[in-house]
Amino acid sequence: MPFEKTMDKIVALAKNRGFVYPGSDIYGGLANTWDYGPIGVELKNNVKKAWWQKFVHESQYNVGIDCAILMNNEVWVASGHVGNFSDPLMDCKECKSRFRADKLVEEHMTSKGVEKASADGWNNEKLKEYIDDNNIVCPDCGKTNFTDIRQFNLMFKTFQGVTEDSKAEIYLRPETAQGIFVNFKNVQRTSRKKIPFGIAQIGKAFRNEITPGNFTFRTREFEQMELEFFCEPGTDLEWHNYWKEYCWKFLLKLGIKEENIRFRVHEKEELSHYSNATSDIEYLFPFGWGELWGIADRTDYDLTQHQNRSGKDMTYLNPVTNERYIPYCIEPSVGADRAVLAFLVDAYDEEELEGGDVRTVMHFHPAIAPFKVAILPLSKKLSEKALDVYNMLRKDFNVDYDDAGSIGKRYRREDEIGTPYCITIDFDTMDNDTVTIRDRDTMKQFRVKIDELKDFIKEKIQF
């Protein structure tokens, strides 16, 4: 019998099993902040490691960087964030609730059956006209008494130094990309990379979102995994397609079901003024389709802006033709937190067993599973041998050890945190140095020699 996969179930499991906790919990929390627990931080780190492996270590084109969160304010003036990084904000005059006007429009479109609803690129007048013409009501109180739409800048301000005046004002970065752009020449010079090449970064970003929500899907503090890939003008659309396919395959290799993802190509009127093409990979969350990964052709906009503002040369000299040009840039950008949420949702399963019992199981790909294996001694008398195996394996893998409760209950605990293989140390182990391995997904069991365990696990975690 099919089960309903809901966000309530995902959130409950995440809290109960140590994936994600509410932020500042003992003080009543802080809205839309979340802390990754012992299991969640392993999952998130594994997702980041997998991304870095495929986008940096296994790519002939790309190198990495780690830029400061705080940057010279001129960076954000040049990039357009100070003047233009805003969302359309409106308030309900009746209940004082605050909303993003574009999201109200998109939710209404979706409710009317529009397949790929989007109000990207709509100005305030067009948004207001749609809201008025369709008599869209406040989601909280049901009234239609809204304020005018105004633009709300999303950057967090703070102060640097001992004085709190306008000269000391500084921003928390709203994206990691600009640190890459301002370091383009440094990286190209020191790495001796030739176009085409990319610069990858994983790091925190901050946006004062008007309506965050849906668990970790939209938060004000989040982590990005971004690649800025620089190419010769005229080859950008070809590279845009290359990275679209690369990102798609990455998700499939790590176990995301193909029926749960789709491409949404931005229409011409949706595109940013500097974009030549943008495509999103959307994931089907329990609350509907949501953007997971954006792949944008940013042309030469960012490097040109920084060249004009800073006065520094951002051109590239082709060593073969001696032609000098500002490279175009393809940006595949994915939120680490959204990616983790997608993997959580995709992995979640409820299986009805013989006898009517239901087991909850997380079908993570072994490469991103928080624990690769769990060591389960059948009896306390076998603890010494079990610890020997545990200590042997944990030098190479993250391994759980559990000797409390019945073996059945221990299996269920490991199923709920997505451990792919449980290794049982039984009395036969003492005689022949073999162990029983239980497969999470099939629940089938088989015996393996202890000295073959490392190779077995290494093979299973490849992707």
Swiss-Prot record:
GO cellular component: cytoplasm
Subunit (UniProt): Homodimer.
Function: Catalyzes the attachment of glycine to tRNA(Gly).
Catalytic activity from the UniProt record: tRNA(Gly) + glycine + ATP = glycyl-tRNA(Gly) + AMP + diphosphate
InterPro entries for this protein: aa-tRNA-synt_IIb, aa-tRNA-synth_II, aa-tRNA-synth_II/BPL/LPL, Anticodon-bd, Anticodon-bd_dom_sf, Gly-tRNA_synthase/POLG2, Gly_tRNA_ligase_bac, GlyRS-like_core
Presence of the UniProt keyword Aminoacyl-tRNA synthetase in the record: yes
Any Pfam family: tRNA-synt_2b
Major site of localization recorded for this protein: cytoplasm
Localization in the cell: Cytoplasm
Domain of life, source organism: Bacteria
Residue numbers binding substrate: R100, E175, F222, E223, Q224, M225, E226, E331, P332, S333, V334, G335
Binding sites annotated in the UniProt record for ATP: 207-209, 217-222, 291-292, 335-338
Record-linked NCBIfam families: glyS_dimeric, PRK04173.1
Protein name: Glycine--tRNA ligase
EC number(s) given by UniProt: 6.1.1.14
GO MF, one example: protein dimerization activity
UniProt-listed Gene3D superfamilies: Anticodon-binding domain, Bira Bifunctional Protein, Domain 2
Keyword annotations from UniProtKB, A to Z: Aminoacyl-tRNA synthetase, ATP-binding, Cytoplasm, Ligase, Nucleotide-binding, Protein biosynthesis
GO BP annotation list: glycyl-tRNA aminoacylation
